[in-house]
Amino acid sequence: MMSTITGCLQEGVIERMKYTLDYQKYAELARRVAAEGSVLLRNEENTLPLRRGQRVSVFGRTQFEHYKSGTGSGGMVNAPYVTNIIDSLKEDGIIQVNEALEQVYREWLKEHPFDVGEGWAMEPWNQEEMPVDEELAVQAAGQSDAAIVVIGRTAGEDKDNSAAEGSYLLTALEEELLRNVCHAFEHTIVVLNVGNIIDMKWVDRYQPQAVLYIWQGGQEGGRACVDVLTGRVNPSGKLSDTIAEDIEDYPSTENFGDPVENFYTEDIYVGYRYFETFAKDKVKYPFGFGLSYTKFQTEILGFSVQGTAVTAIAKVTNVGGVSGRETVQLYLEAPQGKLGKPLRQLAAFAKTEELKPGETEELLLKTELTEYASYDDSGVTGHKSCYVLEEGDYIFYAGTDVRSAAEAGKATLTEPRVVRMVTEAMAPVQEFKRLKPFFFEEKDHAIANWEDVPLRTIDLADRILKERPTKSEYAGDRGWKLADVLDGKIALEQFLTQLSDEDLICMTRGEGMCSPKVTPGTAAAFGGVTEGLKRFGIPIACCSDGPSGIRMDCGTMAYALPNGTLLACTFDPELVEELYEMEGMELRKNKIDTLLGPGINIHRNPLNGRNFEYFSEDPYLTGTMAAAQLTGMGKYGVTGTIKHFACNNQEFKRHDANSIVSERALREIYLRGFEIAVKQGGAYSIMSTYGPVNGLWTAGNYDLLTTILRKEWGYQGIVMTDWWAKMNEEGEPGSGRQTIPMVRAQNDIYMVVADAASNSAGDNTAEGLADGRLTRAQLTRNAENICGFLLRSVAMERLLDREEEECTELHNPISTEGAGDSGQVLARLELPEPKLLEDIELPLEKLSTKKGTSAVYQLRFPKIGRYELVFRMSSTLGELAQLPISVFLNNTLQQTVTLNGTEGQILERVVTLPIRQDGEKYMKLYFGESGIDMHRMFLRYAGQNDIESFRNE
C-alpha cells in the first residue's frame, strides 16, 4: 500500500485526511502495471529474456521516441518525462547495446525529426523509418547476439486507424527493415509500441523469434519494456482482443467507417464471440492468449452449482524454471435455444500471485448464471423484453485463453427461466438483418444465418409525456444553503424550491474549457457557476481529461499512465485499483473532482482510433476494469466519469454517423460494461457520446439515460454531454442548441459554454420552459442529480472549509507551474502611455504556435490597470479540435483560452491581464496543441477601475 489515510466522513465533515503522494512509488507502480500488461505472443528458442552481457542491436526509430499514449483528449497529459527503450536499456545495464548502430540512428534523426503533425487529429499514425539495407543489418549482426526491432503506431480522437500502410499495416520501409534484420540475425525480437492490435501477417513472412506487444505504457513505458525484455518482470499479460488473420475477417469491418450510417449487422457476435462461433480458422492469436518465460500446469479441482451461483476451483502450478504469474479464464457456452448464442462468453477470471518454480496456488472463479441471461428483443422465447435463461446445458470451460479452455463442468436447466423483466428501450427504427448461428450436427462451428432485427413497437413520445414530472414549486429564497442539506437540516427537494427557473437553467450548463473558476487548464467547471447559484452555497466542481492521466492545458504536469488496452491485458483488477488509488491522490491534490475516464467503449473493430483508451472487445472484462479504477479513485473522495455512453465505436464523422444496432446487442454488448461499472464500481458520473444511436443523439436519448440507466439500473448520479455535443428531437437533425431533449432525458449538464449566466451558446432550454415543452419539475430533477453529485464531492468540503487535508509529497519530479519550456524572448517592448482601448501591436514574426512551444514577450507597463490581450486567429481544423493557449505573467498563470477548429474562419479571443504594479513583466504564451494560425495579437488598456481594491486582488 502506498499511502496512509486517516480520517472519516461524519455528519458531512471530513475531519482530517492525511496522505502521502510518493511520486517514486507512483512511478514504480505504473512501471509494474505497464510490464504486467505486456503480452508475449511468440518466443522461439527461448530468445527472451535477454541474458546478462548479451550484445544487442536495436532497430527502429521508436526506440528513441516512445509513444506514451494515443492522441486527442485521452493523451494530452503533460508528463514530466517519458522513458524510451534505448535509454532504458542502457540505464538498466544488463545487456550491451550496439552503440555504433545507435549513433547511426541519432545522426539520421537530426535530419528527420519527429513529425508532430499539423495539430488536433492531424498527427501521423507513424513516423518515417530509417532505411536499413542488408549491408547495415549484416554489419550489426556481426557485432551482436540479438536484434530488437521497435515498431510504433498512434491514433486517437477524431482520427481512426486505417487498413493502410503506416497504420494497421506495416510500411514498405518497415517490411524491408524486418526482412533484412530477420535474415541477418539468428535471434530477432519485435517490440510493438502501439495503442491497439495491428496486422500480424508479417510474423509468418519473416519468422522473428520473439514478438512482444508493450502497447502504450505511459511515461514509464520504456523502462517497463526493458523489465520484460531482461526478465526482471516475467510477462503475464493476456490479449484483451482477438487478433485475426486479416482485417477483413472481423465481421464489423464491412460496415466500419461509413460517414452516415453504421449497421451493427454482426449483432452480439463481437470479437471472440464471432470467431469462436463462426470462424475459428481465421484466428491468428486468440482472446486471452499470452506466453510466459515459464510454464504452468492448470487443473480444475472442483466445480459446483448452487442455484445460479457457479464456482470453479483451479490449481495452478509453476512447472518451469523461473517465477511468474498465470491467469485462469472461465468461459460459458450457453444452449443455442431459440435466440442463438455465441459458443464462448467470458464469465470469470483470476490471476495468481507470483509463483516460484514448483509453487502452487488455488484460484477461486465465481460467477452467476443470471449474469449471462440472453435478452429477448423479439418475443421468440415467449418473454419479450426479458432477460431469459433458455433450457439446456450451460457448459463451462476453463483455461488460459479462449481457444485452449477445456470443459470444467456444467449446469442444466430443464425449463426456461426469466431472470429480469424490463421494458423495450432503444430498439432500432430502420430495417436491417443481423447475424445468427446455424449449426449442422456434425460441425463444431456455425454457418452464418440472417434474421430481421426487431424494430421499435413503443410510442417513445407518449412514454416521455406520461413519465415526465410536473410538480415543482418556486418558493423564493428561504435562506437555506446546500450545506443545510449536507448536515441533514432540510431535504434536497426543499432546498431546490428556492432556485428560480433561471438558476435551474444555468445549472444545466458547464463552463470551459479551461475555466478560471477551477483548476487551471482543466476541461470544465460545473455546479455553482453563476453568482445566483453561488448565493445558495452551491460549490463549483472541476473535471479533467482523461483515460491516460490528468490533462491540464496550461502546461501543468501530471503522471502519464498506461493506456486502457494495456490495463485490460493485465487481467488484474486489484493491481489496476491500486494504481488508480495513486491517480485519486493526484486528482485530489489538484482539486479535480472527476476524471473524464475511464473510456469503456467496446473494441468493435481494430480500426477505431480511440481503442487505446478503451479496454477490450469483451464487456465483462471492460466493466471489471472500469469498476477497479472507480474503486481506487473513490478511496480519496474523487471519481471517474465513465464514457462514452454508448456506441462510440468510430471516430470518423462521430458527431453525426448513426449507429444502427439491435436492442439485444446494445444490452448484451455495448451497455453491459457501463452496467457493471454502475452496479459494481459505484459509478456516479457518466458522459454521453457525440453521435446518434438508432436515430437519436445519445445526449438527448430518453430511453438510454432515463429508461435504462436510471429506472432499470437504479443509477444515482450525473450525466454530462461530450464537449459541444448535439441533441435532437426524433426525426430532426442534431444541434448543439437543442437542449430541450437533453434536459428531458436527464442528461444533466451541457458541456461546455463560455458563460452559463448569459447563455453564451444560445441553447433553447428557456424557450422550451416557456412554451411547455419542458417543465420546471424536469429542470429540478436535473438539478437534484447535480446537487447529489456535489454533496458527495470534495468540492463541497472545499467550499465550506471543512476539508482539513494534509498531503505530503515525496520525490516530486512534477512542475506545478506548467508551460513547458521557458520559451524564447521574441520581443522587448516598452509600451507607450496607454489610451483607453487603443491597440498596441505585438510582433508575430518569430512566433511559433506548434504544440509544446512557449513564446515570451518582455513588456514594460507604464501604469497599473486592466489590460486586454487580444488574439485574432484561425485554424483549418474541424470544429471539435481543441487548441489551448495559456497566458502567464512572470510565470503566474493568468488564463487558458481554447480555440476550436474554425475551418479557416478568423475568430477573436480576449485574456484580461491585471497589472498591479507598473514596470517590467514577462508575458509567456504556451501552446498546448498545434494547428493555430495567428493573424494578429495586440494589447489594449481597459482602465484602472477601483485602484485600491484592484491592488488587493
Predicted feature descriptions by range:
Residues 872:
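N-terminal beta1-alpha1-beta2 submodule of the flavodoxin-like/Rossmannoid cofactor-binding fold
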Residues 318, 875-877:
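Extracellular acidic, Ser/Thr/Pro-rich low-complexity tracts
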Residues 413-415:
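Interdomain boundary/hinge segments at the C-termini of tandem beta-sandwich modules
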